[in-house]
A protein has these predicted regions:
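C-terminal helix-rich "cap/oligomerization" subdomain common to oxidoreductases
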Residues: 1-17, 50, 87-89, 136, ...
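Rossmann-like NAD(P)(H) cofactor-binding subdomain of soluble oxidoreductases
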Residues: 96, 116, 139-146
Length: 390
């Protein structure tokens, strides 16, 4: 059994920006990590970016002056051996997470890994044991906990307005027919490989949100689907079974359905459908053509004007029964959207590292491991065609 040692106090004292090195130069760097860090200059400073060879991916950031003073390093060893680096952000393909994170921890660096933490529960458990034995912080980039729609749902469920939750559907459906220009291997997320399946990518977010709201399920049933026929399960339907609410007289389990379809040809995709004993909640996404939904890219990162603030026409609707009886009338009310705040994850990470207290982490080890266990069981359930116990 691994002995957990206290978190190492920061050299030079608390309160200084955490010097951070980022591995990977894809969209996550330019759209999520760099913009979030830029909003927290008193908490973080990008020290370096690891790019094996110059492929031009950093050019837009350089021209915008967003990488002034940032080192561009060509070997991972340079990052590991640099005593100035305190935190390493692993923003690379899923199958590389374990190797990079293990080396970073062994070099005495705190680590933040893109979801999923790594492809297997065994590897994830080993990484946490290593971090604890070294007195280091290890966390996972579950930024969608800070999405506007999830924060809104979380507050609504906490209010008790809907009564006991009976069932819920949480969806990340899209319509992306296979382009004629498709070539396997161009985009790693569309390249056949077990850890590239949608259940690891979009699924990690949906499962994490369910674990935050309801904890660990008792049973799991799943169907993982290759809807476009490219040799990769890009879609899934996952049922998580939970005991009924403590205040319910029913013995029927609550079922939380998580789904992601890549061929959902609808202008308004369902995001949430929650049914409770006193009312229900329905939330749709805005159509992709809506002006409020600027495409998130290098020109419009997560800090663009209006990001995280959903217009009223996109708010979800709560339907509350006036009386708990057959055929009751309902009140219909729009639920004001909470503001999204992706930098909140980084701010929380700073608090944990700066205070040398991993208990402050919002993304808990137990939750991360639960998410990965659910993913592994979901794949097994799909392969075997049956519901499995957690």
């Amino acid at each position: 059994m691994t002995t957990s040692v206290p978190i190492q106090p920061r050299q030079g004292g608390r309160g200084r920006p955490i010097r951070t090195s980022i591995l990977g130069t894809g969209m996550s760097l330019s759209v999520f990590h760099e913009p979030s860090i830029a909003l927290l200059p008193e908490q973080f400073a990008i020290h370096s970016i690891f790019e094996r060879s110059d492929k031009g991916r950093l050019e837009a950031l350089k021209q915008a002056g967003r990488l002034d003073g940032v080192k561009i390093v060509r070997t991972f060893e340079e990052v590991l051996e640099d005593a100035d680096v305190e935190l390493i952000v692993v923003s690379t393909p899923n199958n590389t997470h374990y190797g990079y994170a293990k080396a970073a921890l062994e070099a005495g660096k705190h680590v933040l890994i893109e979801k999923p933490i790594c492809p297997t529960l065994v590897e994830a458990t080993e990484l946490y044991q290593l971090a604890e034995s070294k007195g280091l912080i290890l966390s996972v980039y579950q930024n969608r906990r800070w999405d506007s729609d999830f924060l809104t749902l979380q507050a609504l469920l906490s209010s008790g307005k809907l009564g006991d939750i009976i069932e819920m559907t949480s969806s990340f459906d899209r319509y992306r027919p296979l382009p004629r220009t498709y070539q396997s291997g161009v985009n790693w997320k569309e390249t056949p490989g077990a850890s590239n399946n949608a259940i690891y990518n979009l699924g990690s977010h949906l499962i994490d949100q369910a674990v935050v709201l309801f904890g660990e399920p008792t049973k799991i049933g799943a169907r993982c689907l290759d809807q476009r026929g490219i040799g990769l399960d890009e879609s899934f339907v996952l049922d998580l079974y939970y005991p009924p609410a403590e205040t319910s007289s029913s013995k029927t389990p609550r079922i939380i359905t998580l789904r992601a379809s890549i061929l959902s040809a609808l202008p308004h995709q369902l995001r949430y459908l929650v049914k409770g004993s006193k009312g229900s909640y329905v939330k749709y996404t805005l159509p992709n053509s809506h002006s409020a939904l600027k495409e998130i890219n290098e020109d419009n990162p997560v800090t663009h004007e209006g990001f995280g603030v959903e217009p009223e026409e996109g708010w979800g609707t709560a339907y509350i029964a006036k009386e708990e009886k057959d055929g009751a009338d309902f009140t219909e009310e729009k639920v004001p959207a909470s503001a999204g705040d992706y930098k909140g994850l980084y701010l929380n990470l700073f608090e944990a590292i700066d205070s040398a207290d991993r208990a402050k982490l919002a993304v808990k080890k137990e939750q991360v491991l639960s998410v990965l266990k659910i993913i592994e069981l979901a794949r097994k359930s799909s392969d075997e065609g049956k519901v499995l116990s957690f």
